[in-house]
């Protein structure tokens, strides 16, 4: 399960519209590193139709905690090419054998 959730996190970092539509739950809520908050609708509105990020940040210290049979918390750090570092926390919910992200928070450090 660790590898599956890791792969889903990486997919979202590429910021494709298709992945956001599929992997973000309708009730998705994010608190960004800036302190701004985002919903699935806001995220989709900010994406260009064919946006793809090619320089993905490094992911360090990735681990998951099973909170229930259908909810997983992923914790990890990211290091971007600029050197910017963030602690990350994601909550994933499994519905009908499909994982969807319903909460994410990033904190710069």
Please identify what each model-predicted range represents.
Residues 1-22, 27-109:
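A beta-strand edge to alpha-helix "cap/lid" segment located at domain peripheries
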